Amino acid sequence: MEVFGDLDKVDDAECVEVDPTRRYIRYNEVLGRGAMKTVYKAFDEVEGIEVAWSQVEIDEVMQSPDNLERLYSEVHLLKSLKHENVMKFYNYWVDDQKKTINVITELFTSGSLRQYRQKHPRVDLKAIKNWARQVLRGLDYLHTHQPPIIHRDLKCDNIFVNGNHGEVKIGDLGLATVMLTPRAKSVIGTPEFMAPELYDENYDELVDIYSFGMCMLEMFTLEYPYSECTNAAQIFKKVSKGVKPAALAKITNIQAKQFIDKCLVPASERLSAKELLQDPFLCSDNSSVLVGTKFPSSLPKSVDVSLEALHMDVDTNESMCTSTCKRNDLGGPHRSVLEFTRTNKNTELKLTGEKLDDNSVSLVLRIADLCGHARNIHFLFYLDSDTAMSVAAEMVEQLELADCDVTFIADFIDLLIVNLVPGQQLMNDAVMSTSSESKMGESEHVITSQQHPSELTHDYVLVEGMMHSKEANASPSDYIDSLLNATNLGGPNSSEGSDISVQLDGSSKSLSEYGVDEYRTLECGAYKGTDKLGCRHPLSNGSSNFAIFQMDQASHHSELVIGASVSITENRDVLNGELGLIEAQYEQWFRELTRMREEALEGARKKWLPDK
């Protein structure tokens, strides 16, 4: 390759990196940041065009097999796809020295369609029809590919624009999947754009048509779908009941509204991309109606979506479990992810937590029965203000669960939070208002034993919402064994409890696999005995309340009691002391887990990046 000019004369502040072939020059200008990658502006010296240079830290990707799978899936798909309405792929390579994975794609001068639409709030109906046709052509290409490809996260954030000639292309295929079977199984996407059948874990490429309809709604109204909802649980409730977004009522053009409705009908009635391209609404361009003139040009704070929009990704038992527990003790940008699973003869609950920043955790709860029916709900947990009980109560209300499930779900959330965020002080709804209640002389419900708090002499840790003693010199395996013994409320004969498994560094292990000689089922919080569990209604019946777990009202335990009434004014110091002990013991446990994690990471690096 013959290049004219001197690279040394390029401003160092602008040119920061050159690819191994010296064809692409990366500038320091950041175009965007995603969940895994940073996108920079770059220049192709051969073609003389500007391109997009996506860069991912290998260490960050290697901590999560899920992230690695997504990255290589996107690269593989982009390499094989060639269509005028699908993002172009140019090249990719791994930089062993800088430990980065680099991908070169085409550059879109106007950013995403959402950004473009926000920048230009007044557009003619003809323009929206033009965008819609291009997106449908891209979807038709993906869906008729052999095998078919489902995007699964189609939204205006993932549709890109070259505004100088109105070109629109589908991009961000990191969550796309190849349809090797007639029906897909995993739940993944952005809640506001997810079709109802996605939550049921049984869907095909028509889920992209539903998402396309939501994209059309955003193009017309400049609003995110379901912006009237404050959380994902409310969105799930409306979607599962077939309630359309409130923004749909703001569309005054009857033909446009009818066209969007065709995309949002049940999957059995939904048209394909090819069929929608033949719709009379798109076949006619003789309209000069301006749209978007009376709608807000910014998204509500509660549903503001950045390039790092959350993705729901919960796989069924039929697929490989890819969630991991990864931690960044150096305070870097890596996200921590942890997953717990509780199973029973009737029900399986899977709670996945991802630490987004210092103050928020993204949680995904999956509730499934033996028949394969499942419900999935995604919600945010704010560490400085939310409590497990308040979030659980909201989930129970939105999902129409039984009231007795609030405590169980709250215990489940507390268990995950205290493991995901070392040192996090668990907030209690009652403790948050101690000052006002102490003045009134009211008592608080705290977790303790029948023994008086002042007589507690052992170290204690919080597991499943209960305090358990731990010998100071116990090893991690002894510690876990003591937890298993302590939480086996029903004794050796209680086989129908709740078991718990932890995903660590890509390998699914139960607690028994970490050095415990004898594994016993973990009971669920205060629930005890073989009669405590029972699914009263099938999960597929979304209109009626159902109980995840039933509490055995007659069951008691001689050592552990939930809800013992203790005065805050008398025992606040004791409570604070116990919380300090909890934090100290979990720190010790996490140090051991960190060591295990580092060993696993090193093994992964040696596997994927062998020394040359």
Swiss-Prot record:
One Pfam match: Pkinase
Keywords per UniProt: ATP-binding, Kinase, Nucleotide-binding, Serine/threonine-protein kinase, Transferase
Keyword ATP-binding tagged: yes
Gene Ontology MF term list: ATP binding; protein serine kinase activity; protein serine/threonine kinase activity
Family of the protein in this entry: Belongs to the protein kinase superfamily. Ser/Thr protein kinase family. WNK subfamily.
Domain Protein kinase: 25-282
Any one of the GO CC terms: cytoplasm
GO BP annotation list: intracellular signal transduction
SUPFAM superfamilies for this protein: Protein kinase-like (PK-like)
Name the record gives this protein: Probable serine/threonine-protein kinase WNK4
EC number: 2.7.11.1
Catalytic activity: L-seryl-[protein] + ATP = O-phospho-L-seryl-[protein] + ADP + H(+); L-threonyl-[protein] + ATP = O-phospho-L-threonyl-[protein] + ADP + H(+)
Residues annotated for ATP binding in this entry: T105, E106, L107, F108, K155
PROSITE patterns reported in the protein's UniProt record: PROTEIN_KINASE_DOM, PROTEIN_KINASE_ST
Active-site residue numbers: D172 (proton acceptor)
Lineage, highest ranks first: Eukaryota, Viridiplantae, Streptophyta, Embryophyta, Tracheophyta
Gene symbol of the encoding locus: WNK4
